[in-house]
Swiss-Prot record:
Record: residues binding heme b: H88
GN (gene name): hba1
Entry protein name: Hemoglobin subunit alpha 1
InterPro entries tied to this protein: Globin (IPR000971), Globin-like_sf (IPR009050), Globin/Proto (IPR012292), Hemoglobin_a-typ (IPR002338), Hemoglobin_oxygen_transport (IPR050056), Hemoglobin_pi (IPR002339)
PROSITE patterns documented for this protein: GLOBIN
GO process annotations (BP): hydrogen peroxide catabolic process
Function according to Swiss-Prot or TrEMBL: Involved in oxygen transport from gills to the various peripheral tissues.
């Protein structure tokens, strides 16, 4: 679980990067689709899956909106993300393994866009946070 130090580090990093969250989401989702082509199946209804396409940008923004929600619910991710968990489990039927894949892509993008802010400490705390988000989103799959 997240320590108070981890929570503070995530909130501090988020305060520095949140203005760029749309770009982070677009790049992370674009990377996931290219590097992990099996994830394309969830977006087969989109006419264009190329990096930066309108649908990819829009969903990247949605994903990062979910991350913003998670930051605001950092003290109780399970309860705070319950609606998103239900949506992904019952409506969208997303394999929860994909949450870890997208989390990794988000880490990669943040490390490249914000190398100064992405300290080793911030990396560890953000990785733990995104693991917690993935676990919370997987809650309704059980």
């Amino acid at each position: 679980s997240l320590s108070d130090k981890d929570k503070a580090a995530v909130k501090l990093l988020w305060s520095k990067i949140s203005k760029s969250s749309d770009a982070i989401g677009n790049d992370a989702l674009s990377r996931m689709i290219v590097v992990y082509p099996q994830t394309k199946t969830y977006f087969a209804h989109w006419p264009d899956l190329s990096p930066g396409s309108p649908h990819v940008k829009a969903h990247g923004k949605t994903v990062m909106g979910g991350i913003a929600l998670a930051v605001s619910k950092i003290d109780d991710l399970r309860a705070g993300l319950l609606d998103l968990s239900e949506q992904h489990a019952y409506k969208l039927r997303v394999d929860p393994a994909n949450f870890k894949i997208l989390s990794h892509c988000i880490l990669v993008v943040i490390s490249m866009m914000f190398p100064k802010e992405f300290t080793p400490e911030a990396h560890v705390s953000l990785d733990k946070f995104l693991s917690g988000v993935s676990l919370a989103l997987s809650e309704r799959y059980r």
